[in-house]
Amino acid sequence: MQVLGKEFNFNMKYFDELKRAMDFLGSHPDTIFVGQAVEYAGTAMTNTLKDVPENKKLELPVCEDLQAGITNGIALAGKIPISIYPRWNFFLLATNQVVSHLDKISLISDYKTKAIIRTGIGSIRPMHPQHQHIGDFTDAYRLMLSNIEIIRLDEPEQIFPAYEKALNRT
C-alpha cells in the first residue's frame, strides 16, 4: 500500500495531522522510516518525524532508486517501511523499483507485503521552489500501478485516516 500526498500547504492543522499520523505509525512495532532527512533536518517533512523513535529511522543519502529497493527488501522481510521522498519530482527516480517490483510482488510471489510511500507536492507559496520541485504525478502513477493504491491528501481531515488505513490493510 502506498500513501502519496500533498504536503506543503503551510497550514498548521495539516502539519499537525501529518505529525499525528507519523507518531501513530512510529508506535507500531514493525514500522521503519526510510529516506532523506528522516533523522537529520533537511526538509519540511523532518519536523513531522521529530517524536518518532530514533531506532525506527534509517537515514539515506540522495539515492531514490536504491531507497525504493531497500523499501522493497524491508517489506519482503516482513516489516513495514515508510519510505519518504520530499517531492514527487525526486520520486520519479524510484519508479523502476516501485512499478516493476513493489507493485508486482503479490502477483509474482506468495508474499503479502506492506509499504507506505510518502511524498509531497511542492508549494509555490510563500516561495516558489522552481519547477523541478512542484510536480504532481498522482494521476500518472495511478495509471502505472495496478496493485498499489495512490491516495492524494488535500485536506487535513484526510491524513490520519489514510495512514491508519494503510497500516491496517491486510
Features from the language model and the residues they span:
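Thiamine diphosphate
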Residues: 1-170
